[in-house]
């Protein structure tokens, strides 16, 4: 088994909504339970910066900066020992592990919950392009279009209906970005990444289990 960590991360780690604590505790639990031959791939900040261009080439366009380059370097290191791997990618999407499944401001945001700050993103556009592109209008259109496809049961509570909407958006938008990232960063290194949590049979089953049984 393999995991990634960063030099001085133990000294400088600061919790966020996405990562309230270090992964190391849970990695140790996994390794102890499964008794695996575990390897930690250590990366440093200069490495991440240097790999940004390769990560952009792998994706064919600018992507998620160090989120991409860290994945690219991780795959490069693991490729020294194997050509195929299983990952936990998509578990949070399938089982509702992200903070936006629980935070009221995200559930009631009226937009894609992982990108609520639309005006800040608009400022990243070239001023000439920004004059021609109404980013919020386009996002609102795609958001409402996506919600038309959400399958709701007659027995669903109001809370369950809202979480179904969030799940649908996460599976069809956010998860697709991560799958594309994994595939491109892996194959750039000749490394195949498989995602068992994304098995359609598991996804279909988990869609209808009670939320209390999810994350």
Predicted regions and their residues:
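ATP-dependent adenylate-handling active sites, centered on carboxylate activation for C-N bond formation
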Residues: 1-156, 161-166, 173, 178-215
């Amino acid at each position: 088994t393999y995991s990634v960590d960063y030099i001085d991360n133990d000294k400088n780690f600061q919790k966020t909504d996405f990562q309230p604590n270090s992964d190391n505790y849970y990695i140790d639990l996994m390794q102890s339970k499964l008794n695996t031959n575990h390897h930690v791939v250590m990366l440093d900040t200069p490495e991440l910066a240097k790999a940004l261009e390769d990560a952009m080439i792998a994706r064919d366009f600018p992507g998620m900066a160090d989120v991409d380059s860290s994945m690219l370097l991780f795959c490069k290191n693991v490729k020294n020992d194997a050509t195929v791997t299983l990952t936990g990618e998509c578990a949070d999407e399938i089982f509702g592990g992200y903070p936006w499944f629980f935070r009221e401001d995200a559930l009631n945001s009226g937009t894609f919950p992982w990108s609520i700050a639309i005006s800040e993103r608009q400022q990243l556009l070239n001023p000439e392009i920004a004059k021609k592109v109404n980013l919020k209008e386009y996002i609102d259109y795609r958001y409402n279009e996506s919600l038309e496809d959400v399958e709701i049961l007659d027995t669903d509570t109001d809370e369950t209906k809202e979480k179904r909407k969030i799940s649908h958006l996460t599976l069809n938008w956010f998860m697709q970005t991560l799958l594309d990232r994994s595939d491109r960063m892996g194959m750039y290194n000749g490394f195949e990444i498989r995602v068992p949590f994304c098995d359609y049979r598991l996804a279909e089953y988990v869609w209808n289990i009670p939320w209390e049984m999810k994350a």
